[in-house]
Regions:
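N-terminal auxiliary segments of SAM/dcSAM-dependent transferases
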Residues: 2-121
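Class I S-adenosyl-L-methionine
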Residues: 23, 70-77, 182, 200-203, ...
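SAM-dependent Rossmann-like transferase core, predominantly class I methyltransferases
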Residues: 90-161
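Conserved SAM/SAH cofactor-binding pocket of Class I
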Residues: 133, 137-224
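S-adenosylmethionine
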Residues: 153-156, 194-302
Length: 303
Protein backbone atom coordinates (compact mmCIF):
# COMPACT_ATOMS: atom_id res chain seq x y z
CA UNK A 1 0.00 0.00 0.00
CA UNK A 2 1.40 3.44 -0.86
CA UNK A 3 2.66 5.43 2.07
CA UNK A 4 2.06 9.11 2.65
CA UNK A 5 4.56 11.78 3.53
CA UNK A 6 4.30 15.26 4.98
CA UNK A 7 6.96 17.69 3.80
CA UNK A 8 7.58 20.96 5.61
CA UNK A 9 10.31 23.58 5.43
CA UNK A 10 11.26 25.15 8.73
CA UNK A 11 14.08 26.90 10.52
CA UNK A 12 16.63 25.30 12.82
CA UNK A 13 14.91 26.24 16.08
CA UNK A 14 11.62 24.55 15.11
CA UNK A 15 13.06 21.24 13.92
CA UNK A 16 13.15 19.24 17.14
CA UNK A 17 9.66 20.34 18.20
CA UNK A 18 8.15 19.54 14.79
CA UNK A 19 9.93 16.19 14.58
CA UNK A 20 8.46 15.14 17.94
CA UNK A 21 4.98 16.31 16.93
CA UNK A 22 5.13 14.23 13.73
CA UNK A 23 6.09 11.09 15.64
CA UNK A 24 3.26 11.68 18.12
CA UNK A 25 0.90 11.94 15.14
CA UNK A 26 1.93 8.46 13.97
CA UNK A 27 4.95 8.98 11.72
CA UNK A 28 7.11 5.87 11.25
CA UNK A 29 10.15 7.91 10.24
CA UNK A 30 11.24 11.53 10.07
CA UNK A 31 14.09 12.69 7.84
CA UNK A 32 15.73 16.13 8.13
CA UNK A 33 17.68 17.47 5.15
CA UNK A 34 19.31 20.74 4.19
CA UNK A 35 17.28 23.11 2.01
CA UNK A 36 20.22 25.18 0.81
CA UNK A 37 23.31 22.95 0.89
CA UNK A 38 24.76 24.79 3.90
CA UNK A 39 27.66 22.99 5.58
CA UNK A 40 27.85 22.46 9.34
CA UNK A 41 31.55 22.28 10.02
CA UNK A 42 32.22 23.04 13.70
CA UNK A 43 29.39 22.57 16.21
CA UNK A 44 30.35 23.47 19.76
CA UNK A 45 31.16 20.55 22.11
CA UNK A 46 27.96 18.74 23.02
CA UNK A 47 25.91 20.73 20.51
CA UNK A 48 23.78 19.10 17.81
CA UNK A 49 23.38 21.56 14.96
CA UNK A 50 20.90 21.61 12.11
CA UNK A 51 20.88 23.76 9.03
CA UNK A 52 19.39 27.28 9.13
CA UNK A 53 16.78 26.15 6.60
CA UNK A 54 15.72 22.53 7.10
CA UNK A 55 13.36 20.32 5.11
CA UNK A 56 11.44 17.77 7.16
CA UNK A 57 9.76 14.73 5.65
CA UNK A 58 7.60 12.56 7.90
CA UNK A 59 6.42 9.19 6.54
CA UNK A 60 3.10 7.62 7.55
CA UNK A 61 1.87 4.11 6.81
CA UNK A 62 -1.73 4.94 7.77
CA UNK A 63 -3.83 7.36 5.70
CA UNK A 64 -3.59 10.97 6.84
CA UNK A 65 -7.02 12.37 7.59
CA UNK A 66 -8.01 16.02 7.50
CA UNK A 67 -8.48 15.87 11.26
CA UNK A 68 -4.95 14.52 11.80
CA UNK A 69 -3.49 17.25 9.61
CA UNK A 70 -5.48 19.96 11.37
CA UNK A 71 -4.38 18.76 14.81
CA UNK A 72 -0.77 18.49 13.69
CA UNK A 73 -0.87 22.02 12.30
CA UNK A 74 -2.14 23.30 15.65
CA UNK A 75 0.61 21.52 17.59
CA UNK A 76 3.28 22.74 15.19
CA UNK A 77 1.83 26.22 15.09
CA UNK A 78 1.40 26.62 11.36
CA UNK A 79 -1.35 26.86 8.78
CA UNK A 80 -2.54 23.45 7.48
CA UNK A 81 -1.68 24.62 3.96
CA UNK A 82 2.05 24.53 4.87
CA UNK A 83 1.84 20.75 5.32
CA UNK A 84 2.55 19.33 1.87
CA UNK A 85 1.11 15.80 1.63
CA UNK A 86 2.25 13.37 -1.04
CA UNK A 87 2.15 9.65 -1.75
CA UNK A 88 5.38 7.68 -1.92
CA UNK A 89 5.94 4.24 -3.37
CA UNK A 90 5.87 1.35 -0.94
CA UNK A 91 9.52 0.25 -1.17
CA UNK A 92 11.97 -1.52 1.03
CA UNK A 93 14.11 1.53 1.63
CA UNK A 94 17.19 -0.36 2.82
CA UNK A 95 17.29 -2.27 -0.47
CA UNK A 96 16.85 0.95 -2.42
CA UNK A 97 19.86 2.43 -0.61
CA UNK A 98 21.95 -0.69 -1.13
CA UNK A 99 21.17 -0.62 -4.84
CA UNK A 100 22.90 2.78 -5.06
CA UNK A 101 25.83 1.72 -2.86
CA UNK A 102 28.35 0.08 -5.17
CA UNK A 103 31.92 -1.22 -4.60
CA UNK A 104 34.48 1.55 -4.08
CA UNK A 105 38.23 1.34 -4.52
CA UNK A 106 40.75 3.12 -2.30
CA UNK A 107 44.29 3.13 -3.60
CA UNK A 108 45.71 0.00 -5.22
CA UNK A 109 44.17 -2.92 -3.34
CA UNK A 110 41.60 -1.76 -0.80
CA UNK A 111 37.90 -2.00 -1.64
CA UNK A 112 34.69 -1.40 0.29
CA UNK A 113 31.93 -3.57 -1.06
CA UNK A 114 28.27 -3.92 0.02
CA UNK A 115 27.18 -7.40 0.98
CA UNK A 116 25.12 -7.85 -2.20
CA UNK A 117 28.08 -7.16 -4.54
CA UNK A 118 31.52 -8.56 -5.29
CA UNK A 119 34.88 -7.37 -6.62
CA UNK A 120 36.55 -9.10 -9.57
CA UNK A 121 40.16 -8.57 -8.52
CA UNK A 122 42.32 -11.42 -7.24
CA UNK A 123 44.60 -9.00 -5.38
CA UNK A 124 41.82 -7.00 -3.76
CA UNK A 125 41.54 -6.55 -0.01
CA UNK A 126 37.77 -6.33 0.40
CA UNK A 127 35.80 -4.92 3.32
CA UNK A 128 32.15 -5.92 3.32
CA UNK A 129 30.16 -2.98 4.62
CA UNK A 130 26.56 -1.85 4.25
CA UNK A 131 25.15 1.58 5.16
CA UNK A 132 24.08 1.45 8.78
CA UNK A 133 23.82 3.29 12.06
CA UNK A 134 27.20 4.97 12.18
CA UNK A 135 29.19 7.32 10.00
CA UNK A 136 31.90 5.99 7.78
CA UNK A 137 31.33 3.90 4.65
CA UNK A 138 34.03 5.54 2.58
CA UNK A 139 31.75 7.89 0.68
CA UNK A 140 32.91 11.06 2.46
CA UNK A 141 36.21 12.62 1.32
CA UNK A 142 37.71 12.48 4.83
CA UNK A 143 37.06 8.75 5.15
CA UNK A 144 38.36 8.17 1.63
CA UNK A 145 41.60 10.01 2.43
CA UNK A 146 42.19 7.85 5.51
CA UNK A 147 41.48 4.64 3.60
CA UNK A 148 43.83 5.64 0.80
CA UNK A 149 46.51 6.37 3.39
CA UNK A 150 46.05 2.91 4.91
CA UNK A 151 46.33 1.29 1.50
CA UNK A 152 49.50 3.25 0.67
CA UNK A 153 51.01 2.47 4.07
CA UNK A 154 50.31 -1.24 3.67
CA UNK A 155 52.06 -1.22 0.28
CA UNK A 156 55.04 0.57 1.81
CA UNK A 157 55.24 -1.90 4.71
CA UNK A 158 55.01 -4.83 2.30
CA UNK A 159 58.02 -3.56 0.37
CA UNK A 160 60.06 -2.80 3.49
CA UNK A 161 59.07 -5.89 5.48
CA UNK A 162 57.68 -3.76 8.33
CA UNK A 163 54.68 -4.71 10.44
CA UNK A 164 52.01 -2.85 12.43
CA UNK A 165 51.37 -4.41 15.85
CA UNK A 166 48.79 -1.84 17.09
CA UNK A 167 46.43 0.65 15.43
CA UNK A 168 44.09 3.05 17.26
CA UNK A 169 40.96 4.32 15.47
CA UNK A 170 40.03 7.36 17.58
CA UNK A 171 36.37 8.19 16.91
CA UNK A 172 35.70 4.99 15.02
CA UNK A 173 32.14 5.51 13.71
CA UNK A 174 31.42 2.36 11.70
CA UNK A 175 34.89 0.99 12.50
CA UNK A 176 35.86 1.06 8.84
CA UNK A 177 39.35 2.44 9.47
CA UNK A 178 40.19 -0.10 12.17
CA UNK A 179 38.78 -2.91 10.05
CA UNK A 180 40.71 -1.73 6.99
CA UNK A 181 43.94 -1.61 9.00
CA UNK A 182 43.38 -5.17 10.21
CA UNK A 183 42.46 -6.48 6.77
CA UNK A 184 45.62 -4.86 5.41
CA UNK A 185 47.81 -6.65 7.92
CA UNK A 186 47.78 -4.88 11.30
CA UNK A 187 47.96 -7.33 14.20
CA UNK A 188 45.54 -5.57 16.57
CA UNK A 189 43.31 -2.49 16.59
CA UNK A 190 41.57 -0.47 19.28
CA UNK A 191 38.39 1.30 18.14
CA UNK A 192 37.19 4.11 20.39
CA UNK A 193 33.96 6.10 20.25
CA UNK A 194 31.61 7.70 22.77
CA UNK A 195 28.55 6.70 20.70
CA UNK A 196 27.14 3.27 21.68
CA UNK A 197 25.65 2.86 18.19
CA UNK A 198 29.10 3.35 16.69
CA UNK A 199 30.56 0.61 18.88
CA UNK A 200 27.69 -1.74 18.01
CA UNK A 201 28.21 -1.06 14.30
CA UNK A 202 31.97 -1.54 14.67
CA UNK A 203 31.55 -4.93 16.34
CA UNK A 204 29.05 -6.11 13.74
CA UNK A 205 31.21 -4.93 10.85
CA UNK A 206 34.35 -6.48 12.34
CA UNK A 207 32.57 -9.83 12.74
CA UNK A 208 31.30 -9.66 9.15
CA UNK A 209 34.87 -9.15 7.97
CA UNK A 210 36.49 -11.84 10.11
CA UNK A 211 38.61 -9.51 12.26
CA UNK A 212 36.59 -9.29 15.48
CA UNK A 213 39.14 -11.38 17.37
CA UNK A 214 41.84 -8.79 16.64
CA UNK A 215 39.71 -5.78 17.61
CA UNK A 216 39.11 -4.15 20.99
CA UNK A 217 36.30 -1.60 21.30
CA UNK A 218 36.34 1.11 23.95
CA UNK A 219 33.81 3.70 25.11
CA UNK A 220 36.46 5.38 27.26
CA UNK A 221 39.34 7.20 25.64
CA UNK A 222 42.56 5.17 25.38
CA UNK A 223 45.27 6.32 27.75
CA UNK A 224 49.05 6.05 27.88
CA UNK A 225 51.03 3.80 28.33
CA UNK A 226 49.11 2.29 25.39
CA UNK A 227 51.51 2.90 22.51
CA UNK A 228 50.24 2.79 18.93
CA UNK A 229 52.25 2.20 15.79
CA UNK A 230 49.51 4.07 13.94
CA UNK A 231 46.72 6.31 15.23
CA UNK A 232 43.95 7.63 12.99
CA UNK A 233 41.48 10.32 14.05
CA UNK A 234 38.86 11.38 11.52
CA UNK A 235 37.02 14.01 13.55
CA UNK A 236 36.69 17.82 13.47
CA UNK A 237 39.50 20.35 13.68
CA UNK A 238 38.42 21.77 17.05
CA UNK A 239 38.54 18.44 18.90
CA UNK A 240 41.73 17.51 17.04
CA UNK A 241 43.44 20.61 18.45
CA UNK A 242 42.12 19.99 21.97
CA UNK A 243 43.22 16.35 21.88
CA UNK A 244 46.77 17.05 20.67
CA UNK A 245 48.57 16.18 23.95
CA UNK A 246 46.51 13.02 24.42
CA UNK A 247 46.85 11.72 20.88
CA UNK A 248 50.57 12.45 20.76
CA UNK A 249 51.04 10.56 24.04
CA UNK A 250 49.35 7.49 22.55
CA UNK A 251 52.03 7.12 19.88
CA UNK A 252 55.07 4.97 20.42
CA UNK A 253 58.43 6.37 19.25
CA UNK A 254 58.33 6.41 15.45
CA UNK A 255 54.55 5.94 15.58
CA UNK A 256 52.47 7.55 12.83
CA UNK A 257 49.59 9.97 13.34
CA UNK A 258 46.94 10.50 10.66
CA UNK A 259 44.37 13.26 11.12
CA UNK A 260 41.36 13.98 8.94
CA UNK A 261 38.00 15.71 9.19
CA UNK A 262 39.42 19.18 8.61
CA UNK A 263 39.30 21.62 5.75
CA UNK A 264 42.42 22.82 3.96
CA UNK A 265 42.15 26.25 5.59
CA UNK A 266 42.08 24.62 9.05
CA UNK A 267 45.30 22.65 8.52
CA UNK A 268 47.71 25.32 9.80
CA UNK A 269 45.96 25.54 13.17
CA UNK A 270 45.99 21.77 13.64
CA UNK A 271 49.64 21.48 12.57
CA UNK A 272 50.56 24.14 15.14
CA UNK A 273 48.66 22.34 17.91
CA UNK A 274 50.77 19.19 17.41
CA UNK A 275 54.11 20.93 16.83
CA UNK A 276 55.47 20.30 20.37
CA UNK A 277 55.40 16.55 19.69
CA UNK A 278 55.64 15.91 15.96
CA UNK A 279 55.62 17.62 12.60
CA UNK A 280 52.42 17.09 10.65
CA UNK A 281 52.34 17.67 6.92
CA UNK A 282 49.52 17.59 4.39
CA UNK A 283 49.47 14.12 2.87
CA UNK A 284 46.67 14.54 0.36
CA UNK A 285 43.65 16.80 -0.25
CA UNK A 286 40.26 16.02 -1.74
CA UNK A 287 37.32 18.34 -2.42
CA UNK A 288 38.62 20.95 0.01
CA UNK A 289 39.38 18.46 2.79
CA UNK A 290 42.91 17.56 3.83
CA UNK A 291 44.57 14.58 5.51
CA UNK A 292 47.58 15.34 7.73
CA UNK A 293 50.24 12.79 8.63
CA UNK A 294 53.39 12.77 10.72
CA UNK A 295 55.75 10.53 12.67
CA UNK A 296 56.72 10.95 16.29
CA UNK A 297 60.47 10.86 16.78
CA UNK A 298 62.16 8.46 19.16
CA UNK A 299 62.68 11.31 21.62
CA UNK A 300 59.08 12.46 21.37
CA UNK A 301 60.14 15.73 19.76
CA UNK A 302 58.99 16.99 16.35
CA UNK A 303 60.34 14.81 13.54
Amino acid sequence: MPQQAITLELDELDAEHVEQACFEAGAVSVVLTDCRDDAILEPAPGEVRLWPATRLQAVYTEPLTAETLAQLAIVIGCAPSRLQVSEIADRVWEREWLRDFQPMRFGERLWICPSHASVDDANAVVIKLDPGLAFGTGTHPTTRLCLEYLDARAARDSHSGSDTPLVIDYGCGSGVLAIAALRLGAAHAVAYDIDPQALTATLDNAAANGVAQALTIANEAPQAPLAADLLLANILSGPLCELAPRLAALLKPDGELVLAGLLEEQAAEVIAAYSPWLTLRPWRSLEGWVCLAGTRSAAGEPA
